[in-house]
Amino acid sequence: QSATNNGYVTYTSTVSGTAVTLLVSENVHTQSGVNPLSARSFSVAETSSDDVIVAKAGNDTITTGQGHDTLIYNVLDASDAKAGHGIDHWTDFGFGSTATDSNAETIQFSSEFFNDLLSDSDLTSSHLSQVEKFIKVDYDAATESATVKVDRDGEANGSNYQDLLVLEHQTSNVTLAELLNNHQITIG
């Protein structure tokens, strides 16, 4: 572990030698009483294996490299619209069928993440009409990114989608139906 003056802390894994860089900013109290929001971010260094990453509070940047990687979203704060998560960025999300593409990634939500949404690890586009009440994907061709948005209670209190995850470097349109057919979104 080492710390530098610019707020970066680097931890080196004893297992694989890959580095994980953390950027931590704390709340600052000033004489005028201003209390800026704290920010906690981390970058996961890429590996060549099938990694499982558990998302935490804060705005995380994830780069996983080769392999079929899974990002898991658990409930950190049941009263929060995004279950306690910030807006994460996955820099190298592999879009494709998990059955045929060894680099296709998976976004997994815990069964408690959504209220009244079926828990099924084998979701497909046949579930689209139910899933799209809780999950929305907006593709932006200008930035080549797809934003995964969530509404944890579906239509219960009206539609109120919140940005959860930005899939960067997506050169073609990414849709919820395709993510479901590719088995890249799972629940449970």
Model-derived segments and their meaning:
Residues A45-H127:
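Acidic, glycine-rich calcium-binding repeat modules characteristic of RTX/beta-roll
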Residues S2-A45, A104, S129-G188:
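Low-complexity acidic/polar repeat-biased segments
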